[in-house]
Amino acid sequence: MTRDETDGILARVTDGQVLALEQAAIRIPSTTFEEQRIADHFANYMSDVGLTVEMLEVTHPAKPGVKTRQPIGRLRGMGGGPSLMLNGHMDPGVEMSGWTVDPYGAKFEDGWVWGMGAHDDKGGVVAAICGVEAIVKSGARLRGDVLVCPVVAHKLGGAGTRALIAHGVRADLAINMEHSANTIANVCVGVVMIHVKTRAPELFFRYSAEAKAAYWNPIEQQCEIVRRIGPSLDPIPPGGWLTFTPHPDLPGFPTHTFDTVHKEHYYQKNYTGMSSRECDLLFQIRTVPGQTIGGIRADMTRLLDGIKREHPAFDYELAIPAAGTEHGWCQDPMDIPRSHRLVTALAEGQRRASGAEPVVGGWGRLGNVGDGNILNQAGIPTVQYGAGDIRIYKEWPTPDERVPLADLVTAARAVAYATYRLCA
């Protein structure tokens, strides 16, 4: 691999090429399990570039009659080299209120592209496709196959990537094109959802001493659980209720958020079908490497049993992972050595594309999980990388999603370089 060869590839990624595909993608609404039109657009584009394209039908994990589709583009190598998957999702985040521009207008002004999915994650898919297109146009030959996989339903726990794996799609290496401010996330948190149900017999304002002794309002039971775990988004201190080893690249983690609490009352409209004797709490922990489902379950059981010893009326039921999240929002943390060839190749690509020193570590994806977690858990060494930085917003998900075109172009060139270096 010579400098002239890689310079020739990088030069074939142009602002106009990236902007045109990015704007076309933003203008196609593609909410989760409604990605068919954008899937067809990307499939046709990749086919025109010269990739072999297969369309994979994906069934909704909770609604068997609902289906969507995702393309698998393959640039076939000559053989004898490692294969690389470029993975990004076609479904953007939640469309929040408060947009000041048309979320599907793909406005381009002052170097910024605006719209739903501008960097989460249509921009990532666009950068991947444009990077591979540059390799094809350069005439370079690769030994290993390159798979370009725009997937559906990331926002449904990575259902599209899980469907890829179930379909037998594999690669030796993968880059998950998630927004990371063009930093290389070789380490990322994981996620596990936890469900706790508390119970108590109903008690009215006139009662016996025995009945009162056996009663603890289920909401108040949940309040005690919340108190002992601590405030949402506060770092969980080492040596406390949760067992873990802090990771130097994931400061402030593990941490958690309390997501939902449900309690019914027999005199009020029932929204959940639950009995008024019970209260449900759902919360999530963003985990660090080394933590396991079994370890977290043991920690939670110890915390809850501690409450029971102090309050005999405490009555709980614990599920980890929460029912319905086992094959979605239950993802292991990932940690790839900085010396891994995937990391070093992409770092050199970022250096060449940007002219600046690359940043490797957890910073750009701090707190996020991506489909890269799923790929890595399936045995495919993966990093997460892409344009866009959610720290520029006051909230996330957000209105007015936007990304600098220059960052998308840099990402496309960095990926083109890494792909050529790894697969040539």
Regions found by a protein language model. Name each.
Residues 1-4, 199-424:
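Metal-dependent amide/peptide-bond hydrolase catalytic core
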Residues 83-85, 113, 170-176, 193-195, ...:
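Short glycine-aspartate micro-motif
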Residues 97-98, 109-111, 131-147, 232-239, ...:
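Phosphate-handling active-site elements
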Residues 119, 123-231, 399-416:
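Fold-level recognition of mixed alpha/beta catalytic cores in primary-metabolism enzymes, strongest
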